[in-house]
Amino acid sequence: MPKRTDIHKILVIGSGPIIIGQAAEFDYSGTQACLALREEGYETILVNSNPATIMTDKEIADHVYIEPLTVESLSRIIRQEYPDAILPTLGGQIGLNLAVSLSETGLLDELGIELLGTKLDSIDEAEDREKFKELMNELGEPVPASQTVNTVDEAVEFAHQCGYPVIVRPAFTMGGTGGGICHNDAEMRTVAKNGLELSPVTQCLIEKSIAGYKEIEFEVMRDAADNVMVVCCMENFDPVGIHTGDSIVFAPNQTLSDREYQMLRDCALKLIRALKIEGGCNVQLALDPQSFQYNVIEVNPRVSRSSALASKATGYPIAKMAAKIAVGLTLDEIKNPVTKTTFAEFEPALDYVVCKIPRWPFDKFTQADRHLGSQMKATGEVMAIGRTAEEALHKAVRSLEIDEKDLFSAEAHHAPTDMLEKKLRYPQDDRLFYLAETFRRGYSLQQTHDLTKISPYFLDIVKHLVELEDDLSTKPFDVETLITSKKYGFSDATIARLWHTSSQEVRKFRKQNEVLPVYKMIDTCAAEFASSTPYFYSAYDHENESQRTKKPSILVLGSGPIRIGQGVEFDYATVHSVKAIQRAGYEAIVINSNPETVSTDFSVSDKLYFEPLTLEDVLNVIDLEQPVGVIVQFGGQTAINLAEGLAKNGVNILGTTVDDLDAAEDREVFDQVITDLNLKQPIGLTATTHSAVIKAAEKIGYPVLVRPSYVLGGKAMETVYNQEELQQYLQQNASITADHPILIDAYLEGRECEVDAICDGKDVLIPGIMEHIEHAGVHSGDSMAVYPPQHFNDDIKRQIVTATEKLAVALKCIGIMNIQFIVHNHEVYILEVNPRASRTVPFLSKITGIEMAQVATRVILGQSLADQGFTNGLYPEPQTIHVKAPVFSFNKLANVDSYLSPEMKSTGEVMGTDTTYEKALHKAFSGAHIQVPNDGKILFTIENGDEKEVLPLAKRFAQIGYQVFTTPQTASHFKDNGIHIHQEISNIDELNCLLKAGQIDLVINTMRHDYEQDSLGFQIRQSTIAQNVPLMTSLDTVNALLRVKEDQSLEAITIK
């Protein structure tokens, strides 16, 4: 079938901010889809609220709207643009839910707008738990015993009928939001209540648990002519019971017999045909390991997280194909862009093994509940490729950028036996390391299988690696043992640990004996057809398939897995750096380990190496490619941390030198620079012992800001108000050394701001000053920010510009840098300097039109700012107002305190743009799904000492019709000042009743000292999040919301 000519203009719905369950994979799929539609000649409109994406670049679609993803906002854009059709299946669950909601308003029928790809009936049939169960029964496909419920009592009643354990699956949610496994009535009442509240249709499926079955995923495609094919079959290392987003996954499947594979494949294809899905679809199946019995778990009728993984694992661009299918093309008409000779209907074949491991945020949230179940908790993931499953697993572990670089964990090694077995029986994020430890202690495969229900095949992979560890440790500097270990993915650092030497010595010995990796190509067809894909992975094997070209090359280091503090913003900068390198006439090479991102789309760079971002793996690529130099400024702290090791190995670091990168992080050197430039900074001291930290704090005076050096995202950063709190901080953050000291700064009250600047060594371009809406003490990544600034006069701006110019030149910055300031008593103080791209680069780039990463890259490559047409100083401010708002995933992470602090907690961001500050704020709040009705009900729970600051806010809310609720200690103060209290709430149970009944629309909680889990302030915050009620812990955020509500309020005025 040829592509459709009756439609010309297509609106694509993006996925919005990154949250747990919906991350960078949708930037990748949305970008692919928009470009595919433009390639076919269609006019495209993109709507997305997330500025930190490649998808929202103006060249990706004909019309780009960075607007809230709400029915109201989309309706306005649809009436403005009049598209012929909407493509909703590339925006994750948000895209699907919006398509359903838009249809229910009648707008699509009114304007004659068609939904492309999967039709509404199919979406409904796949997403509505009851309808899906009915369809499975019609098709004769087995599903676990289940019942759809709309109340908690119905859920408990069914659990009694079928027996515990049961799984709760809310309808129309993603990442298992609100779901969980329940073992008794108490757990059922808690989980079902939460699931029903989070389901947009107040519906859950209660399902008899089949935990322990093998979990198999098929990524399948179908077109309008009913051609179907399997892109990839993936097998979860973890059995059913752990959300697939929190599972280790292998591709292709590792343990299925041909009979099992064909049986499950037939089921997957039957389902996509029955649902009449046009495009990509993810089918999840559970297989009884003791028989040929299986159950259908669910179908995602859209491009998903697994689609991105399958695309990168096979090289088959699922989202691109899905977009082309949506406009009428069929699989037998679309050329495979990898081989350029075969068609899209040919199923990919893999002659390698891929391993995905999730990246969890528990290094940031040490108090969080780390248990894994049916609700996803990972913020991102890594992927590794090897010739064996062992090699892929080892490479994936070291891609995670956590304390463990292999399967050895000191914590697991010292754990008592009962703790070890508990960790296996009740899985947490670190189960893999405890699993390895059981084999070191002599457990059999059967014993570990009984504890974990993990397939003996996967257990044997871990056991084999432990056995190889033992062999290695007894044969230091043995060439044959070295070769074997490298084939199974052992790093030089791991071998060095086992040989009691340094990784440099292992590398030297390896090179002397010519034990070197080769690089293999990903070609989708296991070399069956000719292919020249520039997409490679390393292996200790024969025949190198990556040939160095004569063209000079530049290597760009990516940022690895998405995590809190290092999100998709850094991938955005990486991709734009690649574009600038290519336009400058160089070959652009990328190393990255993240399957979700645009930078790991092999069509973006000239060569892509899917490798761990470790010194060894990067040096191996450099040995082969011999690039002119390496750019580390756009890969976040991941790339910066590699700079010193690379430089010591003779690698040319382009842009700011390693010594100058260190100058910004070394407290003594930096302090001297500030003094020499006659600039101001808060009084600060450095300490390398616990006692020295306490003395420094006493010398400066409380409150103080304490943090380790060399961190990203404010990890382990805290404001402490007395010695007791400082002692507690030091107990929780014990790792303090001469090389990595603790920094202690005076805490200044004032307005924070930040700038991103580009310096060529002489001139300094400042695209804009971003004012933080929250005062000092909230991490910049968790602060709302406004550009242009709303509260700085020309003198303050001049001080900021002068300080930026002086610092950039003095620190010998060549490229990009970020500086954070605080304005205290009309004076500008420097808080910190980051000699790299920051998370605000996409935000400012979208607003100003300056592609900052590209401009900085050209500077790094030797082109001055003047030659690029830029003048020194602050770029002219726009007429429009732009607000960036953080987005959090607290509802996915039990026991994480939501009180905003110097340590970053947000997972994503949105942007609001309009002609006034209040309108821009309104859009930002709306995009972040903070929607408080006019004339609503507000609960104030206030820290002692905050009453004076809170009082005027409460009065203003009351004046525009809001009902005020308080705790007893706040009530008397409010009453004394003439504020009517609608109700006093005296305990947490009373609050829970009101929250459940929908009687509270916003909770304001400033009880910062209540961080213990049994404290009132903490419990109030947890209850508020559990009920999905907006929560604000900063009075500056409250004031911003109040400005919006006052702007929207109509005042009743008497005639005088």
Curated annotation (Swiss-Prot):
Segments forming domain ATP-grasp: 133-327, 671-861
Native species: Limosilactobacillus reuteri (strain DSM 20016)
GO biological process terms, semicolon-separated: 'de novo' UMP biosynthetic process; glutamine metabolic process; L-arginine biosynthetic process
Record lineage: Bacteria, Bacillati, Bacillota, Bacilli, Lactobacillales
GO cellular component: cytoplasm
Oligomer status and interactors: Composed of two chains; the small (or glutamine) chain promotes the hydrolysis of glutamine to ammonia, which is used by the large (or ammonia) chain to synthesize carbamoyl phosphate. Tetramer of heterodimers (alpha,beta)4.
Binding site for Mg(2+) 4: E832, N834
A GO term for molecular function: metal ion binding
Binding site residues for Mg(2+) 1: Q284, E298
Ranges for domain MGS-like: 930-1056
Binding site for Mn(2+) 2: E298, N300
Pfam families, per database record: CPSase_L_D2 (PF02786), CPSase_L_D3 (PF02787), MGS (PF02142)
Cofactor note: Binds 4 Mg(2+) or Mn(2+) ions per subunit.
Region called Carboxyphosphate synthetic domain, residue ranges: 1-401
Signal peptide range: none
Reactions catalysed according to its record: hydrogencarbonate + L-glutamine + 2 ATP + H2O = carbamoyl phosphate + L-glutamate + 2 ADP + phosphate + 2 H(+)
Entry keyword annotation includes Amino-acid biosynthesis: yes
Positions with a binding annotation for Mn(2+) 1: Q284, E298
Role played: Large subunit of the glutamine-dependent carbamoyl phosphate synthetase (CPSase). CPSase catalyzes the formation of carbamoyl phosphate from the ammonia moiety of glutamine, carbonate, and phosphate donated by ATP, constituting the first step of 2 biosynthetic pathways, one leading to arginine and/or urea and the other to pyrimidine nucleotides.
Region called Allosteric domain, residue ranges: 930-1056
Residues that coordinate or bind Mg(2+) 2: E298, N300
Annotated EC: 6.3.4.16, 6.3.5.5
Region Oligomerization domain: start-end pairs: 402-546
Protein name in UniProt: Carbamoyl phosphate synthase large chain
Cofactor requirement: Mg(2+); Mn(2+)
